[in-house]
Each structure stands twice: as C-alpha cells, then as structure tokens.
C-alpha cells in the first residue's frame, strides 16, 4: 500500500479505524512478572493479535517486583480516586510501549507495593484483585482506549465481567464492550467471604444467588466471570470437555454446562521468538 496516494491514505485510515481493539487483562505477563503459564500467554498472544491486524494491548498490576529498567521507561498517563465499596483508593495508570505492544500498569502501593506477586489466599488477596478489576473498568475512558473486547484471565480478572454487566451497562461508553474469559486452571477460583459483595464490590444481595456469584455460602470470583462473560475459553478442546464433568469441574461443572454454548477450547501456543533454543 502506497500511503502517498490519496485513495490509499484514506484506505489506511479506514483500516486503522476498523481494527478490532482488544485489551488483555492479566495478573502477570512476560517479560515483567511470571509465576506460571498465564504470563507466557499474556506476553505472546497480544503480539500475535497485532500481527493479525488487531490493536491489542495489555493491562496488569504495577507490582514492586517489576524490574527497574521497565519502571523507568513508563510514562504516567493519569491518576484518580477509585471507589471500592466504602473505601476511596488512589489509582494511577502507567504506560509502556515495548516491541510494538502497549502495556498499562495499574499503580497502587498499598495493593501492589509488596515484594511478591501473589500472597496468602485470604481476604486481602480478594481485595487486591477486586480493586484491580474495578480499576480496569474505571481507567478505560481515562486512557483513551475503549476496547471492543476485554480478554479476562482466571479468577484475578474474572470479576470484571459481573462488574461490567451490573454496574456499567447503563453507561453508553461501555455499551459495545464484550468480554472473553479464559480459564487456565479451574482449581483456582477466588473464593471469599460474602462480605465482599457489599463491602468491596457493591453488588448487593440479589447477586448472592446460587445461579450467579454464590458458592457454598461464599462469593466465587471465577464463577461470577463464567456466568457473566460473553464468551469463555480454555487452554485446549480436551480441557473444555473435561471441566464439564463433575470429576474435573471443581464444583463448577454445573454452571459451565449451563454456559456450554459459549465455551470453546483453544490450544495454547508459544512465542517462538522468546522461546528460541538458538538464543539460549
């Protein structure tokens, strides 16, 4: 395409305008932080989506363990006060472009200024990722990037789906936004005390229902994501079939069978540039 020609220039602008916009929300991402396979996917998939013609970006927490060489390259985009239940918390957004991919980092020292990525699986962990989920949605109009698809991953970002449908549905800015939830490991679900419903999520008693967020008397973040996501994917077709059964379903096989028409299994690939034996 020769951009110097008027017609082709118009075509280029149209193609850019019509690009599918995807925001990949993850609790970890290479090359910044990694504890498991989610970081590999979050690091590789947005790059491939961009090569396929999409405008794919990533949002993750601004953890303290992120190396200084990356932190120094970030630019401050915005900051605001985030309402999380009765709490008012600072929320900053930092931005870094690396290898053609735009990364947004949600900054809050209280939640992410620790020496570790994940902590004990207690209420403080639930509060951290309830904050992260709410911050993702609140930051979208402020970063001037409203995606077509929010790609959520595991329980840490699954609650974005219920929050979007229950608290932002009436806002025209969010009306077109759709969610895809990828389940990497069904065993980890983000199960916390019922108090999260009112104190942090402000979702109210009607959502504490066995068909929605309630799970054995508690709030289940991943279950909420499964119920409210527009589409659900897993890391392989085999795993997608397995989690529909009681043996592999980790107590969520019933809700997954109810969403079976929205569920698909996609085999994970690898970033052959990053995992290249010739460079080892």
Q: Which residues are covered by each model-predicted region?
A:
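Catalytic cores of nucleotide-sugar-dependent glycosyltransferases that transfer UDP/GDP/TDP-activated
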Residues: 11-280
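Short, Lys/Arg-enriched N-terminal segments with co-localized hydrophobic residues
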Residues: 1-10
């Amino acid at each position: 395409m020769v951009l110097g020609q008027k017609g082709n220039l118009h075509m280029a602008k149209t193609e850019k305008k019509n690009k599918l916009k995807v925001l990949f929300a993850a609790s970890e991402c290479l090359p910044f932080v990694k504890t498991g396979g989610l970081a590999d996917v979050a690091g590789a998939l947005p790059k491939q989506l961009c090569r396929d013609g999409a405008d794919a970006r990533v949002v993750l927490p601004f953890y303290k363990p992120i190396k200084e060489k990356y932190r120094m390259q970030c630019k401050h985009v915005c900051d605001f006060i985030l309402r999380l239940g009765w709490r008012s918390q600072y929320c900053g957004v930092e931005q870094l472009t690396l290898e053609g991919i735009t990364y947004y980092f949600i900054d809050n020292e209280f939640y992410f200024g620790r020496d570790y990525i994940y902590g004990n699986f207690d209420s403080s962990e639930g509060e951290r990722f309830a904050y992260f989920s709410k911050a993702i949605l609140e930051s979208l109009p402020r970063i001037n990037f409203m995606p077509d698809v929010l790609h959520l991953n595991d329980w840490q970002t699954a609650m974005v789906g219920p929050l979007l449908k229950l608290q932002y549905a009436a806002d025209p800015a969010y009306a077109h936004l759709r969610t895809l939830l990828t389940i990497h490991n069904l065993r980890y679900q983000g199960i916390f005390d019922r108090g999260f419903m009112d104190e942090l999520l402000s979702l109210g008693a009607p959502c504490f229902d066995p068909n929605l967020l309630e799970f054995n008397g508690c709030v289940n973040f991943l279950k909420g994501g499964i119920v409210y996501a527009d589409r659900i994917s897993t890391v392989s077709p085999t795993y997608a079939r397995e989690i529909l059964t009681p043996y592999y379903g980790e107590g969520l096989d019933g809700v997954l069978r109810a969403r079976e028409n929205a569920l698909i299994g996609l085999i994970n690939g690898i970033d052959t540039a990053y995992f290249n034996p010739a460079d080892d």
